[in-house]
Amino acid sequence: VDPVGSAALFKPYGVPDLVLVTDIHGDHFNKGTLEAIVKNKTVVITPEAVAALAPEGLKKRITTLANGKSVEKLGVKIEAVPMYNLTAARLRFHNKGRGNGYVMTFGGKRVYVSGDTEDIPEMRALKKIDAAFVCMNLPYTMTPEQAADAVREFKPKVVYPYHYRGSDTAQFKKLVGDASEVRLRDWYKN
């Protein structure tokens, strides 16, 4: 999901079977990275706004999904969940309908990746999520308090805060409490 940065970062993983892109911003969508890692067998899922900006050579590999739509590819059911801002001062960052969060169902498990979103009703309404990747990164998404409040509502079994640079992940974990198992990872080693 959202491969950005040097293509060398992805080399150890081989050619991806499936790539999902959540939004048009450079920390989610990098044309050069996609051109380097996407090969003939790779399935790419994006919102329409990303597909419109994709290089011509990649457009034929892309399946677009609008909010609320789903598709099955490679045995994975992929549901496009809205991701957007609610706060008036943040509406310019992520307007409703442009980007996607995703729920992927495979091997009997449901995994949610929020994309850049605030504490929206569509996220709170999610059910039976085994693992969730929830963002928190002001001014673009949520505070740790907002993210924890949402997680306490939809109760994924496990939650990984991601896209959190500068946010207090320890505070997030404390606020989630026993509603979900919080697993902290250092996504920013470099």
What function would you assign to each model-found segment?
Residues V1-P3, P16-D27, I45-E48, Y112-G115, ...:
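Active-site neighborhood of phospho(di)ester-bond hydrolases with catalytic His/Asp-centered motifs
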Residues V1-G14, T64-K127, M142, D186-N190:
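Core dinuclear metal-dependent hydrolase active-site scaffold
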Residues G32-I37, L53-G57, E122-A125, Q146-A150, ...:
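A short acidic, amphipathic alpha-helical/loop segment
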Residues G26-F29, P139-M142, S167:
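Glycine-/small-residue-rich active-site loops that bind phosphorylated ligands and cofactors
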Residues G57-L74, A148, R152-N190:
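Binuclear metal-ion centers of metallo-dependent hydrolases, dominated by the metallo-beta-lactamase
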Residues G5-A52, T63, K127-F133:
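Active-site metal-binding motif and surrounding structural segment of the metallo-beta-lactamase
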Residues A51-A52, E118-P121, S167:
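Short alpha-helical
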Residues I129-V134, L138-P161:
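Proline-aspartate-enriched helix->loop->beta-strand connector
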